[in-house]
């Protein structure tokens, strides 16, 4: 439990976590990355946490958010997918096991059901809330593209 609580800001709820741990079922941990460039030292804290969870028996899922990278103008899909594969190889070299599950965002984010969910979310998200998220993501504060408005909804 100590490893799970280290560097954690909030647990909803601790009792549910303890129950899940006691259940004997394999728990899952998830992290998402936009494959938009080189893997760097900033990735290591998350990779280290994932490795520790993996050693505790968690099933690790890594989202390689290729659609996010495309919306954020990081290249065409071919280049982004090459970068995603590079990211996967780097994460494996950093110690994530072969059992790690890697998922490309495009494997589900282009489906009709996901798109309907995204559109429904757009109907209840205020422009102010979306802009707050966009400001954290976008380097260009002026003349942003509509695609950058979708990005926060997909977070």
Q: Can you say where each PLM-predicted feature lies in the sequence?
A:
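NTP-dependent nucleotidyl-transfer catalytic core
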Residues: 1-155
């Amino acid at each position: 439990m100590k490893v799970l609580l280290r560097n954690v800001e909030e647990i909803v709820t601790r009792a549910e976590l303890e129950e899940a741990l006691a259940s004997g079922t394999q728990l899952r941990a998830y992290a998402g990355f936009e494959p938009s460039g080189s893997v760097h030292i900033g990735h290591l804290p998350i990779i280290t946490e994932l490795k520790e969870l993996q050693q505790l028996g968690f099933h690790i899922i890594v989202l390689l958010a290729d659609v996010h990278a495309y919306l954020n103008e990081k290249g065409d899909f071919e280049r982004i997918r090459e970068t995603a594969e590079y990211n996967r190889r780097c994460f494996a070299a950093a110690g994530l096991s072969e059992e790690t599950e890697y998922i490309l965002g495009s494997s589900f984010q282009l489906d009709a059901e996901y798109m309907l969910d995204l559109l429904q979310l757009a109907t209840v998200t205020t422009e102010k809330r979306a802009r707050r998220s966009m400001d954290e993501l976008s380097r260009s504060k002026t003349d942003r593209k509509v695609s950058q408005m979708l990005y926060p909804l997909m977070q």
